[in-house]
Curated annotation (Swiss-Prot):
Coiled coil: none annotated. Residues 135-150, 194-218 have a biased composition (Basic and acidic residues). This is Surfeit locus protein 2. Keywords: Phosphoprotein. It holds the Pfam family SURF2. The keyword Glycoprotein does not apply. Residues 156-165 have a biased composition (Low complexity). The modification Phosphothreonine is found at T190, T195. Residues 133-256 are annotated as: Disordered. InterPro entries: Surf2 (IPR008833). Residues 183-193 have a biased composition (Acidic residues). One of its GO terms (cellular component) is nucleoplasm. Residues 224-247 have a biased composition (Basic residues).
């Protein structure tokens, strides 16, 4: 402290929230946790800020002991505080402490703590209660779960149903000819289907083509042949017109 200039030492005395670090090169604000270079211009600019002015008015001499025994110094990190009600770490600065203590979680935990003190019951933080419930649920759910019934197709033998290989339900009944073509519906016909050879035998013989039908077919063929010849002739003409030999270059020259 004696190594600092007189104006810097006087300025730090006016602002007790600014603490000089051990290396005497930086200044730390206990209200916001900011670190500043130990120079008078930077310190003056910082103290004129709105945030610093608001915190100074709210807590001119901030005392962390007011929030004990609920908020105590952290054993893991000396620059942080620990809340026993919510089991959370807080930065060691008034702004963060005030924000935490004014929050819903802390206020709810504080009310629960006061109720437990009146009833003479030990207070257990809410997060620990949730953890215990999860562990109990996991312990209860460790047993083997009943497996769902595996789906099995119904057997084809039940109720005299047709086998799965039968494909009669996929095609119309007209495609399957029966052996008892000549028998009536009341007759004792069998349900077996005809084979390919039997199907050909069962078909009626084709009628012979008449003379008139033959004449019509010959006339039709003649017309088709004539049309084909006409089309070929027109195509040949077009091909010749497009593939004519170019005139020789000498014939294009004008006589001298």
């Amino acid at each position: 402290m004696s190594e600092l200039p007189g104006d810097v030492r006087a300025f730090l005395r006016e602002h007790p929230s600014l603490r000089l670090q051990t290396d005497a090169r930086k200044v730390r604000c206990i209200l916001t946790g900011h670190e500043l270079p130990c120079r008078l211009p930077e310190l003056q600019v910082y103290t004129r800020g709105k945030k610093y002015q608001r915190l100074v008015r709210a807590s001119p001499a901030f005392d962390y002991a007011e929030f004990e025994p609920h908020i105590v110094p952290s054993t893991k990190n000396p620059h942080q505080l620990f809340c026993k009600l919510t089991l959370r770490h807080i930065n060691k600065c008034p702004e963060h402490v005030l924000r935490h203590t004014q929050g819903r979680r802390y206020q709810r935990a504080l009310c629960k703590y006061e109720e437990c003190q009146k009833q003479g019951v030990e207070y257990v933080p809410a997060c620990l209660v949730h953890r215990r419930r999860r562990r109990e649920d996991q312990m209860d759910g460790d047993g083997p779960r009943p497996r769902e019934a595996f789906w099995e197709p119904t057997s084809s033998d039940e109720g005299g149903a047709a086998s799965d290989d039968s494909m009669t339900d996929l095609y119309p009944p007209e495609l399957f000819t029966r052996k008892d073509l000549g028998s009536t519906e009341d007759g004792d016909g069998t349900d077996d289907f005809l084979t390919d050879k039997e199907d050909e035998k069962a078909k009626p013989p084709r009628e012979k083509a008449t003379d008139e039908g033959r004449r019509e077919t010959t006339v039709y063929r003649g017309l088709v042949q004539k049309r084909g010849k006409k089309q070929l002739g027109s195509l040949k003409k077009k091909f010749k017109s497009h593939h004519r030999k170019p005139k020789s270059f000498s014939s294009c020259k004008q006589p001298g």
